[in-house]
Amino acid sequence: MATLKTFRTLVQLKHKLGKAYEIVGEPRLPKWFHVEYLEDPKKMYVEPTLVEIMFGKDGEHIPHVECTLHVLIHVNVWGPEKQAEILIFGPPNFQKDVAQMLSNVAHFCRMKLMEKEALEAGVERRLMAASKATTQPTPVKVRDAATQVAPVQVRDAAIQPAPVKVRDAATQVAPVQVHEVATQPVPVQVRDAATQPVPVRVRDAATQPVPVRVRDAATQPVPVRVRDAATQPVPVRVRDAATEPVPVQVRDAATQPAPVQVRDAATQPAPVQVRDAATQPAPVQVRDAATQPAPVQVRDAATQPAPVQVRDAATQPAPVQVRDAATQPAPVQVREAATQQTPVEVADDTQLVQLKAGEAFAQHTSGKVHQDVNGQSPIEVCEGATQRHSVDASEALSQKCPEDLEGGDTETSLDDSYVIIRPSRAVWEPFVML
């Protein structure tokens, strides 16, 4: 008969009658445990092998579990054939919770045990297979000889060598020879003899040389000669003879040589006057002479001091004014004297000599100059004004104001185109004293 095995616990209990248990001896009970909890314990059954897995060897973890859960756990084991009995003493709600917890722990330990048993069984099977392999050498040799060696030899002998030889002899060599003999050499010879040489010769003889010669002889040389002879030389000659030389000669003879000859003959002033008179209109000269010179002389005479004007008239302005009058066209001087009488009268006090000379020159030359301007060309007017009336002006000045010009110096240009009159010292000395 199996003996009862008990595990360690905080309070040793003994089964009394029915479901009642009693305390063995007089142990010290925990404060959270009461005696009435011994009357109706909660029972559960597990495999005996799981008891030591759950509570340790001989139940060494039971006292710690009891203190933690505030219940008493009593385990009875009657051998490996029977299931172990677990008794839970405590409040009813605690009994239910602890029983559920212990069942979960038992299930977890059961699964671990099954894995362990399966692992051990697998290891045993592998060990058995290994032992069989070591103890049975003949099957190993048979497997190596029957499965490995024979197929390898058959594949090497039947599959590889035969196809290689057949492919080399039947498929590779014969087609190569046939291809070289039937397709390559014959077409090469035919193409070289029939297709290539003949077209080359035909193209060289029929297509290339003939077009080259035709293009050189028919298309290129002829147009070149025609263009050189018909298109280029003729226009060049026509342009040189008809368009360019004639205008050049006409322009040289009509426009350029004539002024050059006139300038050479008159020593530069005459051509300038002729070109100005011929190219520019007469109204331009009238406007310039009427608007610009007269106001300048009036402003100079009215605004500048008398001594400055006398000194300028005695030393510098007198030659300048006479030279301007001699080089510029006579109509300008006549028009200045004839049209601008009022400004001249303003300068009577300061420039007496110039005023009288201007009046005399205006009286003698105004009628003649207007007649010459109306009846002659601008060139003749300028020549008549500069050459013909210079003597009249000097005579008029000497006859009109002999008392003022007496004792003064008079100079005439080489070509008698103008007269320079320098008043005597008695005339301009009173102005200098001022």
UniProtKB/Swiss-Prot annotation:
The subcellular localization recorded is: Cytoplasm; Cytoplasm, Cell cortex; Nucleus; Mitochondrion
InterPro entries linked to this entry: KH_dom_type_1_sf, KHDC1, MOEP19_KH-like
Q: How does this protein assemble?
A: Component of the subcortical maternal complex (SCMC), at least composed of NLRP5, KHDC3, OOEP, and TLE6. Within the complex, interacts with NLRP5, KHDC3 and TLE6. The SCMC may facilitate translocation of its components between the nuclear and cytoplasmic compartments. Forms a scaffold complex with OOEP/FLOPED, and interacts with BLM and TRIM25 at DNA replication forks. Interacts with PARP1; the interaction is increased following the formation of DNA double-strand breaks. Interacts (via C-terminus) with NUMA1.
Which intervals of the chain are annotated as region Required for interaction with NUMA1 and regulation of apoptosis in response to DNA damage? 334-434
By sequence similarity, the record places it as follows: Belongs to the KHDC1 family.
Where's it mainly located? Answer: cytoplasm
Could you mention a single GO BP entry for this protein? positive regulation of neurogenesis
Task: Please indicate if the UniProt record lists Nucleus as a keyword.
Answer: yes
Residues covered by the KH domain: 40-118
Q: What is this protein called?
A: KH domain-containing protein 3
Gene Ontology annotations for the cellular component aspect, listed alphabetically: cell cortex; centrosome; chromosome; cytoplasm; cytoplasmic lattice; mitochondrion; nucleus; protein-containing complex
Pfam families on file = MOEP19
> Has UniProt tagged this entry with the keyword Nuclease?
no
Phosphothreonine PTM positions read 267, 279
- Sequence segments annotated as region (Involved in RNA binding): 1-39
Lineage start: Eukaryota, Metazoa, Chordata, Craniata, Vertebrata
Q: Which PANTHER family match?
A: KH DOMAIN-CONTAINING PROTEIN 3, OOCYTE-EXPRESSED PROTEIN HOMOLOG-RELATED
Q: What is known about what this protein does? A: Component of the subcortical maternal complex (SCMC), a multiprotein complex that plays a key role in early embryonic development. The SCMC complex is a structural constituent of cytoplasmic lattices, which consist in fibrous structures found in the cytoplasm of oocytes and preimplantation embryos. They are required to store maternal proteins critical for embryonic development, such as proteins that control epigenetic reprogramming of the preimplantation embryo, and prevent their degradation or activation.
Q: What is known of its domains?
A: Contains 1 atypical KH domain, which is still capable of binding RNA.
Q: Which UniProt keywords apply?
A: Cell cycle, Chromosome, Cytoplasm, Cytoskeleton, Developmental protein, Mitochondrion, Nucleus, Phosphoprotein
GO molecular function per UniProt: RNA binding; structural constituent of cytoplasmic lattice
